Amino acid sequence: MAYFPHTPQEIREMLNTIGVDSIEELFSEIPEEIRQKAKENFKLSASPSEIDLLEEIKQISKKNIGKDYISFLGGGAYRHYIPSFVKLVSLFPTFYTSYTPYQPEISQGVLQSIFEYQSLICDLTGMEVANASLYEAGSGIAEAALMSVRITGKKEVIVSSGLNPEYISVLKTYLQVQNIDLKILPLDENGETDITALERTISPSTSGVILQNPNFFGVIETKLKEMETLIHKNNALFILSIYPISLGILKPPSEYNVDIVVGEGQSLGIPLGFGGPYLGILATKKEFIRQIPGRIVGETIDLEGERGFVNTLQTREQHIRRAKATSNICTNEALSAISAAVYMALLGKKGIKKIAEVCFSRAHYLKDRLQKKLGIDFIYPNSYFFNEFVIKTPENSKVFLKKLEERKILGGIPLSKFYKEREKEILIAVTERNSIEEIDYYVKSLKEVLKKD
């Protein structure tokens, strides 16, 4: 897209239209102190040469850390290996856009790729239909909650406190402006959703119950079937947030009779990025297809008998009837969805299972080493987990992690970032990118920090 700055004449016309004499007057409501500070912070040299500008950016980028650090960060964004082929296909000029086409049948290549993505998500989750993707998991959770309200006609949503706190924050933002009640369930002593609390809280007024498996603290929910029975007994919808890679070894959501599956697709071949772009997964039962937000690509046969692909059921969408649309999802993450499709097709079921097994085994190897070598205390020692767990620290977790950072280790997420009362707890994640050597170095470094003999 070309960039053409406003001409002096255009600026004058705009100022005249709003009845302002100058740009200075336009911003006069902002205190001079703040304006001056902004000028200092964003001051640029006059028309730098390209080489000077690149050098300046290079110097600024040195403030970032990451490439030379061993990472044990998780909490919804994971450092998985991305095969070169995924990057190659994703950068094809025909795919290199975030847009799904508006015209029902234009861009057959893009439409087929999105159709394959939808099919692969259905294979992974066991669900019947999937959409063409959403922005990320947070908005996906919110859209699923709104789906439950539309389908049931009820305006009360229950969510487990085991759901990623950032997703809960997004959910609150969506629901509060639509006057939908949100109730949050506590966890039990093992870090699982308290089923007794669910029994007390759920009612005929509940539209949907949202759980996450594995949950934010890495704990695997073992009572999903019992909770599913309880949810459907009250004519509510069962919504489950997933970690896609974990489905390589965990049962698919369909086996728990889940109504709507949502999740963060970043682990499926999408690079880590501060702010994205990531990928919101949403899949559901066929009976709810007309309430799905966003695009849906379908397969059809044209007049000449050839297989083709189209945007289907478009009357649900905001560009057809904005006031009655199921959502305002428009420019979705189609490029991220295509990357995920290439990743899943390349690895296949066996490949995803293998990655899940490696994540599982190395995380358990680390926990075992921490327990036996260092006597580390765990927050949920008796719970099952996939590739994340929470440890206790002898001092403030941020101070503790800073000491590991000095040894070029990103040791985990301080839970005090989300929960003030958990200032001595760290969430640790392990993926296939963490070699046994890295794990051993982590244990060795922890020993030094703890000053263990």
Curated annotation (Swiss-Prot):
SUPFAM superfamilies: PLP-dependent transferases (SSF53383). It is an enzyme of class 1 (oxidoreductase). This is Probable glycine dehydrogenase (decarboxylating) subunit 1. It comes from Dictyoglomus turgidum (strain DSM 6724 / Z-1310). The glycine cleavage system is composed of four proteins: P, T, L and H. In this organism, the P 'protein' is a heterodimer of two subunits. Keywords: Oxidoreductase. GO terms for biological process: glycine decarboxylation via glycine cleavage system; nucleoside metabolic process. GO terms for molecular function: glycine dehydrogenase (decarboxylating) activity. Its EC number is 1.4.4.2. HAMAP family: GcvPA. It catalyses: N(6)-[(R)-lipoyl]-L-lysyl-[glycine-cleavage complex H protein] + glycine + H(+) = N(6)-[(R)-S(8)-aminomethyldihydrolipoyl]-L-lysyl-[glycine-cleavage complex H protein] + CO2. Pfam families: GDC-P.
